[in-house]
Amino acid sequence: MRFPLARGAALPLLLAAGVAACGSATPTSASSTSASSTSASQQLTLYTSVTQNTVTAVVAGFATADPGVKVSVFRATTGQLNARITADQHSGGLRADVIWGTDPLSMESFAQEHLFRPWPLPGLAGVPAADKTTYFWGTRELYLVIVARKGLTPMPRTWSDLTSPAYRGQVALPDPAAAGSAFAALGYFDTAPGFGLGFYQALKANGAVQVATIPEVVTDVAQGRYQLGITLDSEVRAAIAAGSPVVMDWPSDGAISLYSPIAETVAAAGAANTAAQAFLRYVLSPAGQNA
């Protein structure tokens, strides 16, 4: 199941879904870090909500490929990133030269605010047309799946099975206000035949609990707080590789596919414009994709 580029109707539904919340996200992953050469002559500010492991590897790879650019990184959840961008706009203007998000919905809203500089990147024939616009480009394909506690029986076979009384109070959901991929899932279920807002209402009625972030879903299932959850397949794979007692449950009606977009902002000017374009080229290159 592929998530489309943008769903304007999803935001009101985010406010109406009414799934029980456990609390707001904390900015534990937000930081200002840098990867640079001591002789750096250009500065680049990156705002991102991608996983820490991903951004660390990519920025380190870029520093090796282009040591003349110093990259300062602000990483946070999608909700915190949106708040930072709004604060920038109310205090002198956007400070990010590049924004790298985890869902197309949030990036589309930034594009509508005219925060991005249109630039058709050259030499990127391998990027599917569905994963790029005039303003931003898809960098990684993400999949939302079900994570289950190891040994759980019976296992759910479909997304709708999460509303079964057999799993009452045992399902964890990521907060759409904090996690871009969770927001994308909300947008998908809103428009998918057989789901709609009623799916979230059924989850709520079945005792599903909303937690702060995508990684927290996996952690809570691993620790036995819940038996099931909705999360990214990459988080489940990493947890399994680390020995966590969880398994990945790929629904028979399909995982939810979305992409992680990146864009140059209108704040990137002069040398920052050159650095931003170099960074985008790297992220979308084979080296950046394999970082």
Model features per residue range: what roles?
Residues 23-25:
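Bacterial signal peptide processing site
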Residues 45, 49-56, 76-82, 94-226:
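Extracytoplasmic ligand-binding site segments that recognize negatively charged/polar headgroups
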